[in-house]
Amino acid sequence: MALARVVTFEGVGKDRMAEMDREMREGQPPEGVQTTEIVVLHDPEAERSLVILFFETEDDYRRGDEVLSAMPAGDTPGRRTSVTKYDVAARMTT
């Protein structure tokens, strides 16, 4: 069963989000992070962001969580306010 790591951030301005978007497009996930997909949602007026990382296995999730939890604050979109693990119960793309 796939798993999702859902992270909320505050203090994410438009400029920082544009910078993160550029870094994600040009780079690779951090070493040890084996995601199948990353979705980033941004509310520029509230300066909040929600990041959803999808993992195929529990081991991939565990390793990714360890790496991402240890990241320096400057490598994240803003101030991390929560991290929650979810089972991916259903998924559809069109």
Model-assigned labels for residue ranges:
Residues 1-50, 56-70, 76-94:
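Short S/T/G/P-rich N-terminal loop/turn motif that feeds into the first structured element of a domain
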